[in-house]
């Protein structure tokens, strides 16, 4: 677990191109694109400054993490998707300093104690939570699933409400 590094705002562009291929993440998500990367691989980023500090996001590939983000990687005994859901559920913002500019430090985050189940259970839990996450946050899969659920609900109530034969008997 470590903090990202400073990069000048003048080095960040809004649109990805051949000379700025790497996403640049700050404490609250994607800031833009840069020429260089300082991290590589699947990671979790935790926002460390501002009112939204403590938010957690999954990133992968080559990217640049600014000083406003804490970068953490999984270990063999920890499923990164499980860790994402656990950290998100923990509401890390509650551990932020109570100042004009709330903040989290790597030191404070690394002292938090959590219980981690066996890796097989982590995979199972992460798989279930990932499915729910997709259904609730991804319009391409969530919306059709919601429409299908409402269609079934409609058919159920339609069949119940329009079954006059049962009422006459």
Language-model region placement:
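Charged, alpha-helix-forming regions
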Residues: 1-169
